[in-house]
Curated annotation (Swiss-Prot):
Protein name: Argininosuccinate synthase
Gene this chain is encoded by: argG
Annotated residues for binding of ATP: 8-16, 117
Entry superkingdom: Bacteria
Stored SUPFAM superfamilies: Adenine nucleotide alpha hydrolases-like, Argininosuccinate synthetase, C-terminal domain
Organism: Clavibacter sepedonicus (Clavibacter michiganensis subsp. sepedonicus)
Length: 417
C-alpha cells in the first residue's frame, strides 16, 4: 500500500492543485480533509466531491462548528482574547482545531504525514505544524506552497493543464480566511497601509455610516459562557451566529490594523468580527461587575499572554493549559445580563446586572441611605500612604546631607601664576 498524506483542504485553487502536486512530488496518495468551522460559502458535500475529482483517494468532511464554538471560541471569550489589543484571533483559533482533525484522520487512515496550503511567510504554517507536532510527533508536515515551489501562477497553469474542476479566478487579489468567529482579508491593494479599505471588501458587516434603527440586545452569561440572547437560550454557536447577523447589520466589528507576525514582519490586515467584538465587550463589562479589582488587574496580563500564545501557534502548550486553568477559575462568578445598543459601528453597554455582583448600591450611593463609613477613610489613607511618606523623609534627609557636605567643602585655592 502506498504511503498517504492527509491534506487540509479548503476547496480553493491552491489546495485543489495541491492534491496532484503532492502526489507528483512525493509519490504519496492524498487524502483530503475539509473541516467546517462555519466559514459558509459552498456546500461541504460539493467541496468533498471536488477533492475526489482533483485526485484525492479519499475525502473526509468534518462538521466542527459546535466544537469550534464550545472548545475554542468560548475559551477565547473568557480570555477576552485580542492580539495586540485589536485582533480577535479569527484564524489563530481555527488552526489548532483543524490540525487536531488532521492528526486524528492521519492516524485513523494510516498516513505518515499531513499537509497544508500555507505560504512560508505567514503565521498559519507555524500554527498547523506546531499543533501537529504537539499532538502527533510521529507525523511529518508538508507545505506544497512553501516546500514544493507551488506558486499561484504555477497552480493556475497546472489546473488548466489537468482540467481541474475549480474556478481559477484572478479577479480577486485578496487572500481571505473566514469562520464563524470572523473574516480576515489581506494582500492586494491592502498591502500599502496608506490605502483605505473599500466597501466591496466586506462581507460580514454593513456600512456603519449608513445609520439604521438601533438594535437592543441583552446577552446572558453563566460562568463566563454566553447562554442566551433576550432571554432565549442558545448554544454558543447559535449565539455567535445570531450576533454576527445583528451586530454585522450595524457595521460592528470592522478592524483595520498593522500587526506583528510571528515570522518577524509586519502585515496589514482587515478583519470583520461582529459577534466577537460584541461578545468581548459584553464579557469585559460583566467581569467589571463581578470580579475583584486585583483579580481583574492580574487577569489583563494573563489575557495578553494567552492571546500571544494562541497567535503564535502554541494552543497545545503547557503554559497555555496553565493559563486556561487560571482563567477558568476566574469565571466562577461571571454570570449575569449585559444590555447593549447596536448602532453605527458600535456595541454600547447600557445596562448590567448579576446575582453575583460586587457592586453594592448602598455603599456606592451618595444619597440618603449611604452605608459607607467615610470616617474610616482618613485612617486608611494614613496607612496607605505611609510607605511613601517614610521614603520621602529618607530621600529628603539624604538630599539635605549631600547639600551640607557640599557647603562644608572648602573652595580650592587659585592656582599660582
Amino acid at each position: 500500500m502506498a504511503e498517504r498524506v492527509v491534506l487540509a483542504y479548503s476547496g480553493g485553487l491552491d489546495t485543489s492543485v495541491g492534491i496532484g502536486w503532492l502526489k507528483d512530488a512525493t509519490g504519496k496518495e492524498v487524502v483530503a480533509l475539509a473541516v467546517d468551522v462555519g466559514q459558509g460559502g459552498e456546500d461541504m458535500e460539493v467541496i468533498r466531491q471536488r477533492a475526489l475529482d482533483c485526485g484525492a483517494v479519499e475525502a473526509v468532511v468534518v462538521d466542527a462548528k459546535d466544537e469550534f464554538a464550545d472548545d475554542y471560541i468560548v475559551p477565547a471569550l473568557k480570555a477576552n482574547a485580542l492580539y495586540q489589543k485589536r485582533y480577535p484571533l479569527v484564524s489563530g483559533l481555527s488552526r489548532p482545531l483543524i490540525a487536531k482533525h488532521l492528526a486524528r484522520v492521519a492516524h485513523e487512515l494510516g498516513a505518515n504525514s499531513v499537509a497544508h496550503g500555507c505560504t512560508g511567510k505567514g503565521n498559519d504554517q507555524v500554527r498547523f505544524e506546531a499543533a501537529v507536532a504537539a499532538l502527533a510527533p510521529d507525523l511529518t508536515s508538508i507545505a506544497p506552497v512553501r516546500d514544493l515551489a507551488l506558486t499561484r501562477d504555477k497552480a493556475i497553469v497546472y489546473a488548466n493543464e489537468h482540467d481541474l474542476p475549480i474556478e481559477q479566478s484572478k479577479k480577486s487579489p485578496y487572500s481571505i480566511d473566514k469562520n464563524v468567529w470572523g473574516r480576515a482579508v489581506e494582500t492586494g491593494f491592502l498591502e500599502d497601509p496608506w490605502n483605505g479599505p473599500i466597501e466591496d471588501l466586506y462581507e460580514y458587516t454593513q456600512d456603519p455610516d449608513v445609520l439604521r434603527e438601533a438594535t437592543e440586545v441583552t446577552i446572558t452569561f453563566e460562568a463566563g459562557v454566553p447562554v442566551a440572547i433576550d432571554g432565549i437560550r442558545y448554544s454558543p454557536l447559535r449565539i455567535v451566529q445570531e450576533l454576527n447577523a445583528a451586530a454585522g447589520a450595524h457595521g460592528i466589528g470592522r478592524i483595520d490594523v498593522v500587526e506583528d507576525r510571528l515570522v518577524g514582519i509586519k502585515s496589514r490586515e482587515v478583519y470583520e468580527a461582529p459577534a466577537a467584538m460584541t461578545l468581548i465587550e459584553a464579557h469585559e463589562e460583566l467581569e467589571a461587575l463581578t470580579i475583584e479589582r486585583d483579580l481583574g488587574r492580574y487577569k489583563r496580563g494573563v489575557e495578553k499572554d494567552w492571546a500571544n500564545l494562541v497567535y503564535d501557534g502554541l494552543w497545545f502548550s503547557g503554559l497555555k493549559r496553565s493559563l486556561d486553568a487560571f482563567i477558568e477559575d476566574s469565571q466562577r462568578h461571571v454570570s449575569g445580563d449585559i444590555r447593549m445598543t447596536l448602532r453605527g459601528g458600535r456595541a454600547v453597554v447600557t445596562g448590567r446586572r448579576s446575582e453575583t455582583s460586587l457592586y453594592d448600591f448602598d455603599l456606592a450611593t451618595y444619597d440618603t441611605g449611604d452605608t459607607f463609613d467615610q470616617s474610616l477613610s482618613k485612617g486608611f489613607i494614613e496607612l496607605w500612604s505611609l510607605p511613601s511618606k517614610i521614603s520621602a523623609r529618607r530621600d529628603l534627609a539624604v538630599e539635605q546631607a549631600a547639600l551640607a557636605a557640599d557647603d562644608a567643602t572648602p573652595a580650592a585655592a587659585p592656582a599660582a601664576e
